Amino acid sequence: MQTVEGYLNKIIFHNKENNYYILSIFLNDKYDFAEGDYLSVVGTFNDFEFVEDDLYSFKGEIVQHRKYGIQLSAIVVEPVIEKDKEALVW
């Protein structure tokens, strides 16, 4: 299983009936499998609300979609609390 951290760039698709998402994330680090700074993440995330520009950690399998290229098929998502000074709210 691969763990990937990134900032939510945008929600490309959301099926409200089954909570299936297609997301675009801006990667927080360099990954060998990534073809650039962005990665598509797909998966079903029940009882979870995404906020654009927030940092998330995804766990899943890297897949090669025949039409859309490299994606992370995620089964786990967690918000990441940033630990730098700019992230602190007073």
Which residue stretches match the model-derived regions?
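Long, highly charged, low-complexity intrinsically disordered interaction regions
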Residues: 12-90
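Short coil-to-beta-strand transition motifs
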Residues: 1-5
